[in-house]
């Protein structure tokens, strides 16, 4: 069983662990006895990790000093893997992937098509949640890298993940015996895989070319949900046209923007405190001037060799005052009950997730409907509505689909 599907208590040799260096810096490690993991915090022996519970802190003493460096060793999950994985392409981060899976109603009985494996970030999330994942990658080098990665992580061994080397825009989604794929065929040479997919995720430069090829591989028994991941609004526009031409319904485009908030407590600063501070500065200024004048008078009367007076020492070492929220003073721990505090927060300026437009649609195959008649009916609107706005054309096409279903 894959480490991404179930939790383990302790680390064993050969396990994949994620070394937590900071919130945005995680490093994947395959634990091997005798090897060393080098970081700016020091060198950590893999042997020290074996037998420790996941989540443990591994600490070492820095040579030549009393300072300690440490890391945390974590259980790999799809969410943490998306932060630490080696990037071969842009990836789908957790803020997007979690929303996509919820909207597509992905569950352990779902059969998912993912076109555009890329770095495999979303593939791990699908493999954990879905009944079976069919992933496609057109780039041969990335296909081999992803296949090896899935094998090492136990996704192929679990039997619910199939990755195929294919350009789905040109060659479609059907998997047959003889194709370059991780699926193990048994039986005659003409054997092909029954996909019956009910969740479709397209992360492609031109998803509108792949949408017509979905007809033969989607489920005929239940509702099919689709999501297209497109960085540019021009891609969204062409995708919407393709979805409507193929009879997809409930089309909606959204964008997810996730920012983190840093929350802390800040001491309440009042006007009386500011006025008192100004008075204190003015009072100390006058006292300093008076002490300096006395010192000058004593020096002129007793000669230049007179040692520093007590007043000089007082000027160099002024007594510390109580805490001043507007200036220097005694240190106060955040949240001290002797002072009044208020809750404040600050949002990070940059959006670190890869933001794109998410276009959702759904389809239910009506076996009683004549698909040829449907396309001919929609073609009349395409010809008559060529001078209309795109929004009006979409409205007419949607109305045509409803009229056909009533017939």
Swiss-Prot record:
S-adenosyl-L-methionine binds at residues 119-121, 137, 142, 167-168, 203. Residues 310-322 have a biased composition (Basic and acidic residues). Keywords: Methyltransferase, Nucleus, S-adenosyl-L-methionine, Transferase, tRNA processing. The keyword Isomerase does not apply. GO terms for cellular component: nucleus; tRNA (m1A) methyltransferase complex. Residues 296-308 have a biased composition (Polar residues). It catalyses: adenosine(58) in tRNA + S-adenosyl-L-methionine = N(1)-methyladenosine(58) in tRNA + S-adenosyl-L-homocysteine + H(+). GO terms for molecular function: tRNA (adenine(58)-N1)-methyltransferase activity. Gene3D superfamilies: 3.10.330.20, Vaccinia Virus protein VP39 (3.40.50.150). InterPro entries: SAM-dependent_MTases_sf, TRM61_C, tRNA_MeTrfase_Gcd14. The keyword Methyltransferase applies. Its EC number is 2.1.1.220. It is found in: Nucleus. Residues 284-335, 388-407 are annotated as: Disordered. GO terms for biological process: tRNA methylation. Its main location: nucleus. Catalytic subunit of tRNA (adenine-N(1)-)-methyltransferase, which catalyzes the formation of N(1)-methyladenine at position 58 (m1A58) in initiator methionyl-tRNA. Belongs to the class I-like SAM-binding methyltransferase superfamily. TRM61 family. Heterotetramer; composed of two copies of TRM6 and two copies of TRM61. This is tRNA (adenine(58)-N(1))-methyltransferase catalytic subunit TRM61. It comes from Kluyveromyces lactis (strain ATCC 8585 / CBS 2359 / DSM 70799 / NBRC 1267 / NRRL Y-1140 / WM37) (Yeast).
